[in-house]
C-alpha cells in the first residue's frame, strides 16, 4: 500500500515546470553507484480498505517492497535511469484474497544535444492490486486492480538567449482488470503541447502555452470521449535558489462526442520557499475539468484544488512533514443513457486529503518513518462519501 507519506512531492503543475537539466538529482542513497538495492517493510492500520461509504472494513496491513534502481551516464550527454519495485501487501481482515501483489517499473532517458537543446523521455508502468486512490461511488468489491502506463516526452531548446521553447507530449492508459469497472473507466488520455517563454528579467520569464488533449474510452458508449484545446499565459518567477513561483491562466474549449461543447476557465498557480536547509513550504491552486469515476451519470468534474506542503528538518537526523489537499468540486450531470430526456443534476462534492509524517535517518542507508493519513469525501450522493484513516510505521534499508 502506498501511503501519502504526508508530503506531496509533485503537483498538478508539473507540466508547466521549467525544463530541468538532463542530469536530474539522484536520491542521496543512490548517489555514487550505478546499481542500488533497497527494501522497505511496514505495517499500517487502514480503517476503510475498500473506500466504502458505509459498513467500512478495517484491517492491519503488512507490506514488503524490494526495489532495484539503475542510474547511469551512457555518454557525456546521455543519462539513463530505471527501477523495478514489486510490493506484497498482506491484510489480516480482508474478505476474499488476503495477499495482494503490485509492481512498478519506471525508466528515463535524457540526452543533451547541446547546452540549449535537450530531450527527456520517461515511461512509468504500474500494476496495483491495492490502489491508493479508491473509486468514489463504485460498488464495493474485492478487486479494484488498476494497471496503468504513462509516457512523457519533452524536447527543450532555446533559439535565442532569452527565448525558450518546449515541445511536450503525454500518453496515459488506465486499465481496470475488473470487467464492471473496466467497461466504465478504461481509457487513453493523450496530451500534446507547445510552450514558449521569454526572459523579461533575470528572475522573471513570461510564458505562453497551447495544449491539446484527447480522452478516448475503450468501450461504448463513445459519447464519453472528449477533445480539448487549452490556451494559456503566465509567468515563472525565481528569486534565487530559495523562492520560486509559477502561474498559468487561460481557457479550455472541450468538445464531446454526443454532448454540446463547453468553454471553461483554466488556472494553475504554485509557489515554493526553502526557508532553511532541508526545510520548505510549498502551496498551489488549480482549476480544471477532470474525469469522473461515474461517466454514466456525469460528463466531467469541475475541480478546485488547493494544497499546502511543509517539510521541516527538526535536526540533522529527523525530518517532519505535513500536507493538506482540499478539493471542492462539482460533478457535471449528463443525459441518462437509459432515457436521454432525463438529465442527471449537478452534484457538489468536497474532498480533503491530509497527512503528517516523522522520518528518522540514523544513517545514509536507513530511514524509519511513522505517518498518519486522513481522507474525507463529502458528496451530494451518499454512496460517494468516504472516511478513511491510515496509521503506518515503515523502514527502508538501502544496500
Regions found by a protein language model. Give the residues of each.
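Cleavable N-terminal export/targeting peptides
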Residues: 1-27
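Gram-negative and organellar
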Residues: 20-399
Amino acid at each position: 500500500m502506498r501511503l501519502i507519506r504526508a508530503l506531496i512531492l509533485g503537483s498538478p503543475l508539473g507540466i508547466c515546470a521549467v525544463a530541468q537539466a538532463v542530469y536530474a538529482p539522484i536520491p542521496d542513497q543512490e548517489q555514487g553507484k550505478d546499481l542500488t538495492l533497497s527494501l522497505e517493510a511496514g505495517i499500517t492500520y487502514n480503517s476503510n480498505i475498500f473506500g466504502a461509504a458505509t459498513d467500512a472494513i478495517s484491517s492491519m496491513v503488512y507490506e514488503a517492497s524490494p526495489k532495484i534502481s539503475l542510474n547511469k551516464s551512457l555518454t557525456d550527454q546521455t543519462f539513463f535511469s530505471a527501477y523495478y519495485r514489486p510490493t506484497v501487501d498482506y491484510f489480516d481482515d480482508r474478505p476474499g484474497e488476503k495477499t495482494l501483489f503490485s509492481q512498478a517499473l519506471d525508466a528515463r532517458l535524457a540526452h543533451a544535444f547541446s547546452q540549449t537543446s535537450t530531450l527527456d523521455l520517461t515511461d512509468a508502468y504500474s500494476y496495483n492490486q491495492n490502489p491508493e486512490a479508491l473509486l468514489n461511488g463504485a460498488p464495493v468489491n474485492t478487486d479494484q486492480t488498476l494497471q496503468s502506463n504513462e509516457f512523457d516526452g519533452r524536447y527543450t531548446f532555446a533559439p535565442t538567449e532569452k527565448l525558450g521553447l518546449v515541445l511536450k507530449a503525454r500518453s496515459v492508459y488506465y486499465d481496470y482488470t475488473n470487467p464492471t469497472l473496466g467497461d466504465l473507466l478504461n481509457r487513453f488520455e493523450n496530451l500534446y503541447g507547445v510552450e514558449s517563454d521569454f526572459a523579461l528579467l533575470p528572475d522573471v520569464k513570461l510564458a505562453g502555452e497551447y495544449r491539446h488533449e484527447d480522452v478516448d474510452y475503450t468501450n461504448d458508449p463513445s459519447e464519453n470521449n472528449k477533445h480539448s484545446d487549452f490556451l494559456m499565459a503566465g509567468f515563472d518567477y525565481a528569486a534565487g535558489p530559495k523562492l520560486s513561483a509559477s502561474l498559468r491562466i487561460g481557457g479550455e474549449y472541450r468538445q464531446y462526442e454526443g454532448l454540446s461543447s463547453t468553454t471553461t476557465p483554466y488556472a494553475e498557480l504554485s509557489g515554493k520557499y526553502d526557508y532553511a536547509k532541508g526545510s520548505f513550504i510549498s502551496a498551489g491552486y488549480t482549476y480544471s475539468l477532470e474525469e469522473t469515476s461515474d461517466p454514466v451519470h456525469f460528463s466531467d468534474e469541475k475541480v478546485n484544488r488547493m494544497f499546502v506542503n511543509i517539510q521541516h528538518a527538526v535536526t540533522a537526523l529527523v525530518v517532519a512533514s505535513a500536507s493538506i489537499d482540499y478539493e471542492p468540486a462539482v460533478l457535471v450531470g449528463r443525459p441518462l443513457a437509459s432515457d436521454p430526456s432525463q438529465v442527471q443534476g449537478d452534484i457538489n462534492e468536497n474532498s480533503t486529503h491530509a497527512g503528517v509524517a516523522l522520518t528518522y535517518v540514523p544513517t545514509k542507508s536507513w530511514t524509519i518513518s511513522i505517518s498518519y493519513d486522513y481522507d474525507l469525501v463529502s458528496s451530494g450522493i451518499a454512496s460517494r462519501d468516504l472516511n478513511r484513516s491510515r496509521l503506518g510505521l515503515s523502514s527502508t534499508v538501502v544496500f
